[in-house]
Amino acid sequence: MKVGGFQPVRGTKDLLSEEYYKLFHIQNVAQEIGERFGFMPVQTPIFEFQEVFCKTLGDSTDVIGKEMYTFADRGGDVLALRPEFTAAIVRLLLSEKMQPPARLFTAGPVFRYERPQKCRQRQFHQINYECFGAGGSQADAEIISLAYCVLEVFGLHCDVTLEINSLGSSECMNAYRASLLSFFEKYRSELSEDSRRRLQTNPLRILDSKDATDKEILSTAPSIEDFYDAETRASFEGLKDHLTNLGIPYAVNRRLVRGLDYYTGTVFEYKTSSLGAQDAIIAGGRYDNLVAAMGGENVPAIGFAGGVERLAALMSYSRTRKFCVFILPISEEVVSHAMRITYEIRRTLSGVQVICDIVTRLKTGIKRADRQKADIALILGDEEVNRNAVSCKNMLTGKQEEISISNITEYLKAMMAERQ
């Protein structure tokens, strides 16, 4: 552990004001869009019992095998920082005894021990939507359209490609898994180390390999489409029809699988070519067996997550700047008067930033106001106090005038109206 220099832990970063505003703008807008679709906000703890994730994500996944942050507390419980939201939201659904149908939105930080790179840190933020109690292709299309709406609002829908696939029913997946196992056994010695490990645990995960040799082998691998039953085939055709009807362009990718083992049926990803290897910015799918696997009843469910930092890297955002008032008491004797004026403006005017800075030289105070990009500087000295007034300097035009303290709020309202 390197402490010298007091830098952030590798894979984490500080958020300065502009980036903070951008990330939380994304989360706030995402929540508002979710509410249009009937999703209500909830929040789960940052850490859960480790079993919440180990029981659901799959032992063969990188998240469980290599990436999860775990620790034992003083009571002996083994806990984990959440590596994703879905399992935690299912736990919430069950522990709070929510009855489906339920549509839940959440957002916040998640944690994975990965190799840090562009748009891939060990602490990052996600927006997350989970829909419980809705099955069928119509529900799938609605969730995919919600994701499209998020991208559209942020101006990114033209810069992404939607890829869809179906993993089919449990019977389809079992038959396909057996076929893949037989196929990959012929290439065992050529597969990457990760893929050889996945061959023993879940050969479907090899389809997600980024290794060049693995990709070449995959080019002749069996397609899951060959193992669809009639119901799966009809459902997937229905999904394509719904997306076409909604005007949402898509591409079928028969190699598309998700990185967690709980997925069944429809899976999808919105991808971009603008972020290098981290091409998925929104991804999700159906997980009809997960609620039952965690001790609940059989409940159809579908959802998705979006990477907030990845969305932020692609979109432009300019925060609306608050009208800034810089109050300059230029002697200790008038500080109490300046504090009263500052408090009154903050109390009565919304959408305004008020800074009170004690200075001994007016020139220094004006420079500070200029650095702060203040709209108005209110100058208060002994003479102004004696006249029960304040000198108002327009930082844009340089014009300066004296205003009665009793009229200062109305004066600032008028100035704010001019700037709009």
Curated annotation (Swiss-Prot):
<keyword id="KW-0067">ATP-binding</keyword>
<dbReference type="InterPro" id="IPR004516">
    <property type="entry name" value="HisRS/HisZ"/>
</dbReference>
<dbReference type="GO" id="GO:0005524">
    <property type="term" value="F:ATP binding"/>
</dbReference>
<dbReference type="Pfam" id="PF03129">
    <property type="entry name" value="HGTP_anticodon"/>
</dbReference>
<keyword id="KW-0648">Protein biosynthesis</keyword>
<dbReference type="GO" id="GO:0006427">
    <property type="term" value="P:histidyl-tRNA aminoacylation"/>
</dbReference>
<dbReference type="InterPro" id="IPR015807">
    <property type="entry name" value="His-tRNA-ligase"/>
</dbReference>
<dbReference type="InterPro" id="IPR006195">
    <property type="entry name" value="aa-tRNA-synth_II"/>
</dbReference>
<dbReference type="InterPro" id="IPR036621">
    <property type="entry name" value="Anticodon-bd_dom_sf"/>
</dbReference>
<dbReference type="Pfam" id="PF13393">
    <property type="entry name" value="tRNA-synt_His"/>
</dbReference>
<keyword id="KW-0547">Nucleotide-binding</keyword>
<protein>
    <recommendedName>
        <fullName>Histidine--tRNA ligase</fullName>
        <ecNumber>6.1.1.21</ecNumber>
    </recommendedName>
</protein>
<comment type="subunit">
    <text>Homodimer.</text>
</comment>
<dbReference type="InterPro" id="IPR041715">
    <property type="entry name" value="HisRS-like_core"/>
</dbReference>
<dbReference type="GO" id="GO:0005737">
    <property type="term" value="C:cytoplasm"/>
</dbReference>
<dbReference type="InterPro" id="IPR004154">
    <property type="entry name" value="Anticodon-bd"/>
</dbReference>
<keyword id="KW-0963">Cytoplasm</keyword>
<keyword id="KW-0436">Ligase</keyword>
<dbReference type="GO" id="GO:0004821">
    <property type="term" value="F:histidine-tRNA ligase activity"/>
</dbReference>
<dbReference type="InterPro" id="IPR045864">
    <property type="entry name" value="aa-tRNA-synth_II/BPL/LPL"/>
</dbReference>
<comment type="similarity">
    <text>Belongs to the class-II aminoacyl-tRNA synthetase family.</text>
</comment>
<keyword id="KW-0030">Aminoacyl-tRNA synthetase</keyword>
